[in-house]
């Protein structure tokens, strides 16, 4: 449909008009870069028109701001648009309109042919508008018209303002002014076409500048256009569906359609590159201000107007979705964790089952291979293989016992081959089989810890050996020691060293280990919490004891059961005692104390003697060992428990507990308080106390069963004393104590010298044959 527009003075294509708001009789019309205009609808003539009233303006020197009642312009002149007639069939002034339109058409055709080649392509690039509301919204100044063109247009408007007010007809019905808001990234080449004046010289100058600037920034804006194309297209389509109106085919002009009361216009944002003087927009204005504001990207637009809203909206929506998804995610995470734990548990259980089955099968195979062997040399090899297997996997001992390995080993021990007998004794001790005790009952030797004060215990043992005329390892069935007592137990029980040699070695160890410069020791104390060199002590132990395992000492038939006690400090909250044994417990018998027989002898001594402050703690496997005296400085009770595990049906005959001397001061502290040093000293003394265990055992055991030898010293001698005169003083005080308790020593020697009765010997023989042939000897081969 063609529209005839009667133009009085000029045609002004409105581009960035934001709103036209007013009342029924006196309405206000707001245009870009224009002051406030009052207009009213005339009911005198059939051709309805609007007439301007007195121009009222408020000026500002900087940017333009528009609000509900005012409009500011950087110019000093008013801008007035007079439209005489908007009709499709008005005959008045038709000739004049045709002349003006022909000129406009020819000009646009020439420009479009010069740039694009045809008019249709130019029209497709013109800014399009979309009807959104019934009020034309106000926009801020965008700087799309040069100052020179604005002044010329204002002069022309003032000149013909009166004429346009008298001649301009307008339809009687109320017009609904509609606004279109488009994104800044959708600008086309001729989006300023709606603002071209009728002075074609100026228009051509304006268009040429705009075209040049457009192609200069085309590369810069191409990426932005591609990114925003799809979003703007979807927004335009959504608005079309909501409002139910078609897009106007002629953007940039005011058109009146028959049967419609809407006047459509375009709200096209200006180009930032075309106009250099772009004015800032107030942050309090509507969203259209920011959509029309030139910007180089979406981030600037969002940061300028809705920068505070978008993060909040995004956060709110995200938080709502997270709140909804949080329980599900939590349940899923919990279920996943449970499933993972269950899978891990089942996997570990399956691995344990497979490992246990494989261990049992391996044990059975070794036992059967040993039973099929007849060659003595090959038997030694088979026995050693089974021994190594049981050392690595102690849980296989039960399977070996079920396969009746003990009777076969006892029969092998009858063969006159020392190497084979030694190998058999070792594996029997590892399985937990024990020979009968030496005397009428179990004889236990327990030695306390105390450093170099162990020479006092040596004096007591010297007296016992003198009275019994037997070495120490033949007098006792079980020897247990802590710290320095463990050293004596190993030297006497495992290495069978004479007492004189032990005393000499004791003095040498004291001079080699406990000779340390005070300054160097203090530095080491602050660094490793050890005053003395622990590495030197380890090297001495390796040289003296070698690399033999504890269980290998069971090869000697005269070797008693020996144990060294240490303290594990990294298992749980409370420290725990650990027993280094040269034997194993029978399957099904569990000791109250941790321990093992697969360790080396020097490792046992090193762990048991790691006194805090003197030597560094010793890491062995996954355990951290310290001095056993921290828990059990008197290991008599532990020795009794271990013996009951080895010989459950044999009574106790004698327990000899040797101390390293004690010092009792007559000085009494004040009644009111004690010093911090005294408090700490009391804690240490209570931890290393030996007399409380003595009092308990002395009251519980039968008479003439428990004997304690611990002399009282006249001087408090430290455990790291290495001076010979002090060691001689300790030795002398030990001898004096023995002289005062000579009757007690004779009683102990008498008990230790008793032999087994004939009935006990017969019982031992019957038990041996029963174990050897799996039945009574009367029904077996003797």
From Swiss-Prot:
Any one GO molecular-function label of the UniProt entry: phospholipase A1 activity
User: What positions does the record give for the motif labelled GXGXXG?
Assistant: 449-454
Glycan attachment residues as annotated in the record: 4, 361
Q: What is its EC number?
A: 3.1.1.-, 3.1.1.5
Catalytic activity entry? a 1,2-diacyl-sn-glycero-3-phosphocholine + H2O = a 1-acyl-sn-glycero-3-phosphocholine + a fatty acid + H(+); a 1,2-diacyl-sn-glycero-3-phosphocholine + H2O = a 2-acyl-sn-glycero-3-phosphocholine + a fatty acid + H(+); a 1,2-diacyl-sn-glycero-3-phosphoethanolamine + H2O = a 1-acyl-sn-glycero-3-phosphoethanolamine + a fatty acid + H(+); a 1-O-(1Z-alkenyl)-2-acyl-sn-glycero-3-phosphocholine + H2O = a 1-O-(1Z-alkenyl)-sn-glycero-3-phosphocholine + a fatty acid + H(+)
Question: Which residues, if any, are the signal sequence?
Answer: none
| UniProt feature, compositional bias: Basic and acidic residues | 220-248
Q: Which UniProt keywords apply?
A: Endoplasmic reticulum, Glycoprotein, Hydrolase, Lipid degradation, Lipid metabolism, Membrane, Mitochondrion, Peroxisome, Transmembrane, Transmembrane helix
Record-annotated active site: 483 (nucleophile), 627 (proton acceptor)
Instruction: State the Gene3D superfamilies in the record.
Output: Cytosolic phospholipase A2 catalytic domain (3.40.1090.10)
For this protein, the parts annotated as crossing the membrane are: 475-495
Which cysteines are disulphide-bonded?
none
One GO cellular component this record assigns the protein to is: peroxisomal membrane
The protein's location, in the record's own words, is: Endoplasmic reticulum membrane; Mitochondrion membrane; Peroxisome membrane
Note the coiled coil stretches, chain numbering.
Answer: none
Q: Which GO terms describe its biological process?
A: arachidonate metabolic process; arachidonate secretion; cardiolipin metabolic process; fatty acid metabolic process; intracellular signal transduction; linoleic acid metabolic process; lipid homeostasis; phosphatidylcholine catabolic process
- Report motif location: GXSXG: 481-485
How does activity track with pH? Optimum pH is 8.0.
In terms of PANTHER family, this protein maps to: CALCIUM-INDEPENDENT PHOSPHOLIPASE A2-GAMMA (PTHR24185:SF1)
The record's function comment reads: Calcium-independent and membrane-bound phospholipase, that catalyzes the esterolytic cleavage of fatty acids from glycerophospholipids to yield free fatty acids and lysophospholipids, hence regulating membrane physical properties and the release of lipid second messengers and growth factors. Hydrolyzes phosphatidylethanolamine, phosphatidylcholine and probably phosphatidylinositol with a possible preference for the former.
Instruction: From the Swiss-Prot or TrEMBL record, give the protein name.
Output: Calcium-independent phospholipase A2-gamma
- Per the UniProt record, the source organism is Homo sapiens (Human)
Q: Which gene encodes it?
A: PNPLA8
């Amino acid at each position: 449909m063609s529209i005839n527009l009667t133009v009085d003075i000029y045609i002004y294509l409105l581009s960035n008009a934001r709103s036209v708001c007013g009342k029924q009789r006196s309405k206000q019309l707001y245009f870009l870069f224009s002051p406030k205009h009052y207009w009213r609808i005339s009911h005198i003539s059939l051709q309805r028109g609007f007439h301007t009233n007195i121009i009222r303006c408020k000026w500002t020197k900087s940017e333009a701001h528009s609000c509900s009642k005012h409009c500011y312009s950087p110019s000093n002149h008013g801008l007035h648009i007079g439209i005489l007639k908007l009709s499709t069939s008005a005959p008045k002034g038709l000739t004049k309109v045709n002349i003006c339109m022909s000129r406009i058409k020819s000009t646009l055709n020439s420009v479009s042919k010069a740039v694009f080649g045809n008019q249709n392509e130019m029209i497709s690039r013109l800014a399009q508008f979309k009807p959104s509301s019934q009020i034309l919204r106000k926009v801020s100044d965008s700087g799309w018209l040069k100052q020179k063109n604005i002044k010329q247009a204002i002069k022309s408007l003032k000149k013909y303002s009166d004429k346009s007010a008298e001649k301009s007809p307008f339809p009687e019905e109320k017009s609904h002014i509609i606004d279109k808001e488009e994104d800044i990234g959708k600008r086309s080449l001729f989006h300023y076409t709606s603002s071209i004046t009728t002075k074609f010289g100026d228009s051509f100058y304006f268009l040429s500048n705009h075209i040049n600037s457009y192609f200069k920034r085309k590369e810069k804006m191409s990426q932005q256009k591609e990114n925003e194309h799809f979003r703007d297209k979807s927004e335009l389509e959504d608005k079309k569906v909501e409002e139910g109106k078609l897009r106007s085919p002629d953007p940039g002009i005011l058109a009146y359609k028959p049967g419609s009361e809407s006047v459509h216009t375009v709200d096209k944002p200006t180009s930032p590159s075309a106009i250099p003087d772009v004015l800032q927009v107030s942050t309090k204005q509507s969203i259209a201000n920011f959509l029309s504001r030139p910007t180089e990207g979406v981030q600037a637009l969002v940061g300028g107007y809705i920068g505070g809203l978008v993060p909040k909206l995004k956060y709110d929506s995200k938080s709502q979705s997270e709140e909804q998804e949080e329980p599900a995610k939590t349940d899923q995470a919990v279920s996943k964790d449970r499933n993972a734990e269950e899978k891990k548990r089942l996997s570990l259980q399956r691995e344990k089952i497979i490992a246990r089955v494989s261990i049992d099968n391996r044990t059975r195979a070794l036992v059967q291979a040993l039973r099929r062997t007849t060659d003595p040399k090959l038997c030694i090899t088979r026995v050693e293989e089974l021994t190594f297997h049981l050392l690595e996997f102690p849980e296989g001992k039960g399977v070996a016992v079920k396969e009746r390995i003990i009777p076969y080993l006892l029969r092998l021990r009858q063969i006159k081959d020392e190497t084979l007998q030694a190998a058999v004794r070792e594996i029997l001790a590892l399985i937990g089989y024990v020979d009968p005790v030496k005397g009428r009952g179990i004889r236990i030797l327990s030695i306390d810890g105390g450093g170099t004060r162990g020479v006092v215990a040596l004096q007591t043992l010297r007296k016992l050996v003198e009275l019994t005329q037997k070495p120490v390892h033949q007098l006792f069935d079980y020897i247990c020691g802590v710290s320095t007592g463990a050293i004596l137990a190993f030297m006497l029980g495992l290495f069978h060293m004479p007492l004189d040699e032990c005393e000499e070695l004791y003095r040498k160890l004291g001079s080699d280990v406990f000779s340390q410069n005070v300054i160097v020791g203090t530095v080491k104390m602050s660094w490793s919490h050890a005053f003395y060199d622990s590495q030197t002590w380890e090297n001495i132990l390796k040289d003296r004891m070698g690399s033999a395992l504890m269980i290998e000492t069971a090869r000697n038939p005269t070797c008693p059961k020996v144990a060294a006690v240490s303290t594990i400090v990294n298992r749980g909250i409370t420290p725990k005692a650990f027993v280094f044994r040269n034997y194993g417990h029978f399957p099904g018998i569990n000791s109250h104390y941790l321990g093992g027989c697969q360790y080396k002898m020097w490792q046992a001594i090193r762990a048991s003697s790691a006194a805090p402050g003197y030597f560094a703690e010793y890491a062995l496997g996954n355990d951290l060992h310290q001095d056993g005296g921290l828990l059990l400085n008197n290991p008599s009770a532990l020795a009794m428990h271990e013996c009951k595990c080895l010989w459950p049906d044999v009574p106790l005959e004698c327990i000899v507990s040797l101390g390293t001397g004690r010092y009792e001061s007559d000085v009494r502290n004040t009644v009111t308080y004690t010093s911090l040093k005294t408090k700490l000293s009391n804690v240490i003394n209570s931890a290393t106390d030996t007399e409380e265990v003595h009092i308990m055992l002395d009251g519980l055991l039968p008479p003439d069963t428990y004997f304690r030898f611990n002399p009282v010293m006249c001087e408090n001698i430290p455990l790291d004393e290495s001076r010979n005169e002090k060691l001689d003083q300790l030795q002398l005080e030990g001898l004096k104590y023995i002289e005062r308790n000579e009757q007690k020593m004779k009683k102990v020697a008498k008990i230790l010298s008793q032999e087994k009765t004939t009935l006990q010997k017969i019982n031992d023989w019957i038990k041996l044959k029963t174990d050897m042939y799996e039945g009574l000897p009367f029904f077996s081969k003797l």
